[in-house]
């Protein structure tokens, strides 16, 4: 429906987003779900998450500008990055559900968000054959589901706010940093070959490489 070049753009966009979004995730949930003594209220995790999401988006802009991509490719990559950033925001709420031993709520929210986002993406691609418009629709659906299924439910359980105690937020940042660095480097290693193909061979080759690479990655 899209052709080799645009499909390759989407493929490398997903790889870049999966790599850079480790900054947004920052292993915050790992610490959040084990904070059984509630050392940090939800607002601290939420504030740190939003800060890391902003850094992720800025990093994605720097990356695409540094690589000199075409305007269309820049737009595709940034839209995919935004989708993954929205995922990381939802992860904050789902981490709170998990900490309260309601992993079922996390699972339902994640299922609905991913299912309907992909469904909208596929349907709009088939109908419009416009990748950028389809990605915008996917992001809108993901945002609406986060607001309706994550934020609205979490609002009845915790206080959703941005805290001003940046000193404690920085302490939380330092706690999460070692695991975050490990995850960032691991994801870079996984995606480094695809990033090299993108730099050396172009979008069409990226599509074919992904078709070969994906089964091997899943098996490993």
Over which residues does each language-model region extend?
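Membrane-interface junctions at transmembrane-helix termini in multi-pass inner-membrane proteins
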Residues: 28-40, 85-112, 132
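Membrane-water interface segments that mark the loop-to-transmembrane alpha-helix transition
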Residues: 13, 18-65, 75-78
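Small-residue-rich midsections of specific transmembrane alpha-helices
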Residues: 6-35, 84-90, 183-192, 210-220
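Interhelical loop/hinge segments that connect adjacent transmembrane helices in multipass membrane
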Residues: 104-109, 131-133, 147-191, 199
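Hydrophobic alpha-helical transmembrane segments
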Residues: 74-81, 108-155, 175, 208, ...
């Amino acid at each position: 429906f899209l052709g080799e070049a645009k499909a390759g753009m989407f493929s490398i966009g997903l790889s870049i987003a999966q790599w850079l979004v480790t900054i947004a995730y920052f292993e915050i949930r790992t610490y959040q779900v084990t904070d059984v003594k509630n050392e940090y209220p939800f607002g601290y995790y939420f504030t740190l998450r939003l800060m890391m999401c902003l850094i992720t988006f800025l990093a994605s802009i720097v990356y695409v500008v540094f690589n000199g991509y075409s305007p269309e490719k820049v737009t595709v990559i940034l839209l995919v990055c935004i989708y993954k950033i929205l995922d990381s925001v939802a992860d904050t709420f789902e981490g709170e559900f998990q900490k309260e031993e309601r992993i079922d709520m996390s699972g339902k929210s994640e299922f609905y968000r991913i299912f309907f986002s992909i469904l909208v993406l596929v349907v709009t691609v088939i109908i419009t054959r416009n990748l950028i418009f389809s990605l915008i629709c996917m992001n809108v659906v993901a945002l609406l589901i986060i607001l309706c299924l994550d934020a609205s439910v979490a609002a009845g359980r915790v206080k959703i706010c941005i805290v001003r105690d940046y000193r404690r937020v920085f302490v939380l940042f330092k706690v999460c940093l070692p695991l975050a660095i490990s995850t960032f480097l691991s994801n870079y290693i996984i995606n480094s070959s695809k990033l090299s193909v993108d730099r050396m061979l172009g979008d069409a080759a990226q599509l074919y490489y992904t078709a070969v690479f994906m089964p091997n990655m899943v098996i490993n």
